[in-house]
Amino acid sequence: MNLVIALLINTGLATILVMVAFWLPQLYTYLEKSSPYECGFDPLGSARLPFSMKFFLVAITFLLFDLEIAILLPIPWASQTSSPYSLLSLSGVLLALLTLGLAYEWLQKGLEWTE
């Protein structure tokens, strides 16, 4: 019961803080706040540069594969199995899944940088 009360209080407090953090800055908008800051100088050009969607997709793909490798590395220590064959089969399945994902991205031309 104490755990439920603590979780509800923490969830409520976090929700209130997030709402205040999003709504409070929107109340006071003025020119200096909405213009780009360039070390005290007047802005020379537009601060809104076009963003390459291809770069974004390659970056997200890299992050996904990097996260999967980070999950794969501690498997020998995190696994509670006594048999090394089950550990090798689990690692093999994860590596096969990574390889299939990479092959799919390659075939869909998700790794090519040409615009």
Swiss-Prot record:
Q: Which UniProt keywords apply?
A: Electron transport, Membrane, Mitochondrion, Mitochondrion inner membrane, NAD, Respiratory chain, Translocase, Transmembrane, Transmembrane helix, Transport, Ubiquinone
**Subcellular location(s) per record:** Mitochondrion inner membrane
Q: What is its main location?
A: mitochondrion
The reaction(s) catalysed by this protein are: a ubiquinone + NADH + 5 H(+)(in) = a ubiquinol + NAD(+) + 4 H(+)(out)
Among the GO biological process terms of this entry, one is:
mitochondrial electron transport, NADH to ubiquinone
Top EC class of this enzyme: translocase
Give EC number(s), comma-separated: 7.1.1.2
Kindly give the Pfam families that the UniProt entry links to this protein: Oxidored_q4
Membrane topology per record: Multi-pass membrane protein
GO-annotated molecular function: NADH dehydrogenase (ubiquinone) activity
- List the InterPro entries: NADH_UbQ/plastoQ_OxRdtase_su3, NDAH_ubi_oxred_su3_sf
GO CC aspect terms: mitochondrial inner membrane; respiratory chain complex I
Spell out where the chain crosses the membrane: 3-23, 55-75, 87-107
What is the purpose of this protein? Core subunit of the mitochondrial membrane respiratory chain NADH dehydrogenase (Complex I) which catalyzes electron transfer from NADH through the respiratory chain, using ubiquinone as an electron acceptor. Essential for the catalytic activity of complex I.
Stored PANTHER family: NADH-UBIQUINONE OXIDOREDUCTASE CHAIN 3 (PTHR11058:SF9)
User: What do we know about how this protein assembles, alone or with others?
Assistant: Core subunit of respiratory chain NADH dehydrogenase (Complex I) which is composed of 45 different subunits. Interacts with TMEM186. Interacts with TMEM242.
Protein family (similarity comment): Belongs to the complex I subunit 3 family.
Q: What is this protein called?
A: NADH-ubiquinone oxidoreductase chain 3
